[in-house]
Amino acid sequence: MVIELRDTDIIWRNARLATMDPAVNAAYGLLKEYDLVVRDDKILAILPTAALQTSRCQVIDVQQRLITPGLIDCHTHLVFGGNRAYEWEQRLNGMSYAELSAQGGGINATVSATRASSHEQLERSAQQRLTAFMAEGVTTIEIKSGYGLNLENEEKLLQVVQHLAQHNPIEISPTLLAAHTCPPEYKHNPDAYMDLICEDILPQLWQKGLFEAVDVFCESVGFNLAQTERLFQAAQRWNIPVKGHVEQLSHLGGSELVARYHGLSVDHIEYLDQAGVESLSHSGTVAVLLPGAFYFLQETRCPPIDLLRQFNVPIAVSTDFNPGTSPFASLRMAMNMACVQFGLTPEEVWLGVTRHAARALGREPRHGQLRAGAYADFVVWDAENPVDIFYELGHNPLNTRVFRGVMTHSSIYNR
């Protein structure tokens, strides 16, 4: 293969590439002693090091370090006001969630704090969290609303997300989660709140270009199937993709409903059954595992991993970063947890934070793979093997982070 190189191209030389490309017949799509050629914001070519002659363009010798696609976190609640650490302490001291809620705690505490926070306050706190994700190699992240629960404050949250996307070297997928829970003012009339979402919040914020998918908490303590379907029908009228928090605490059938609307993903899924798994297999919907919430809530029922494998359902892994049930801004830790708690293999976990996570956000195949034509979003690690990245926690093996072809975190010297 002959490549005509330009002076502005960049060659990342002598690498171990975990491409995650299904066309590469090896675990992790691993290629040893290969060069990665970047032109502008995309990968131009991947070739054996010996096959590519040095030209006048920039050459960066990574000295057999591991290069992977940039990590993708496909489920976070990154923007919120307040802090729930005191509530966690109270729970650890024996107070029940019902008692905390009666005192104004729980999700309503976050809603109140978020409503009381200014744009600037929310931007500052969210920026600190986002910086932590980027420092671990995340190049694409999903961020949900869901702590405003009225038009004004859901718009405020999504405007903060938009601001973060405009001022950081990371791709952000914004999701409308107005159907997170009923706000206090609609506590006894959830159908009326769903009216507000479907008739006002969703269409107005969609027309302002503030989100790209709709999510819902479909659960016995959230919204029922009929209410969830009303939301999906409203989204369908605007051709908006849907996804759902489903089967976390009980089996309600939410996964099958998401699949019926060809949803992007079903998330949590501890109580998913075989009928639900089969529906996901037919629709191509991604199963997103959230081990941080499983750990923090001390759950005991794991998602049906063997069934997902049996029916070839793509599995993604995410942090579910949020203040109440998963306050962990580390996708590497979620990867470790997914292996230890759920029994995923390291390769399944890597697929879950690259190719399958990209699919869960409607971004395959230009994200989550190292291949010609994909975006040049990748990470150089001080490591030899993919499993090294999340085996040992407590220090960060990231050497260089590249977003759209540009180094954003680096300790490599050009050679």
From Swiss-Prot:
GO molecular function: imidazolonepropionase activity; iron ion binding; zinc ion binding
Catalyzed reaction equations: 4-imidazolone-5-propanoate + H2O = N-formimidoyl-L-glutamate
One GO process term, biological-process aspect: L-histidine catabolic process to glutamate and formate
Residues holding Fe(3+): 75, 77, 245, 320
Keywords assigned: Cytoplasm, Histidine metabolism, Hydrolase, Iron, Metal-binding, Zinc
Positions that bind Zn(2+): 75, 77, 245, 320
Cofactor(s) this protein requires: Zn(2+); Fe(3+)
Cofactor binding description: Binds 1 zinc or iron ion per subunit.
Keyword Iron assigned: yes
Listed PANTHER family: IMIDAZOLONEPROPIONASE, IMIDAZOLONEPROPIONASE-RELATED
Descriptive protein name: Imidazolonepropionase
Source species: Photorhabdus laumondii subsp. laumondii (strain DSM 15139 / CIP 105565 / TT01)
Taxon lineage: Bacteria, Pseudomonadati, Pseudomonadota, Gammaproteobacteria, Enterobacterales
